[in-house]
């Protein structure tokens, strides 16, 4: 890589609403791969890099916005305590939603492809490659987060309402044929 892409950031985060294996359609929109990246507010270095990349994307987007940065510009970095106060996974965190029409490459800590879809899920921790870009679509102007690749770093408590089968059931003796 000869020139630095100033709009690209590798974001250490907790994955939420992870649609990384199959594209998902939201409200009838075009299906996309997506993830919500939950970033600890104490990770000031990552948050600063994201803010800098958003500023670069704003500057690069002036051409799409008539030569100036609009006052009511939508940006992707949000405060979980303000925008998601009811969701404890977002407490004391910043977050952003990233998406792409193209499937991300998903790798482990050794940068080997992960093929087992159950290995990467909402609640695990990883790093996500994000490229920030300006848009002007149907009168909406802003900076969006483009989903790149994903690296799983470690497991975490799964997010969502689905219960773990081990918590719901106990082993049954094969000789106990209670359905007979």
Language model feature labels by segment:
Residues 110-126, 133-143:
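Exposed beta-sheet edge/beta-hairpin loop segments within beta-rich domains
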Residues 18, 101, 131-133:
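Generic short beta-strand segments
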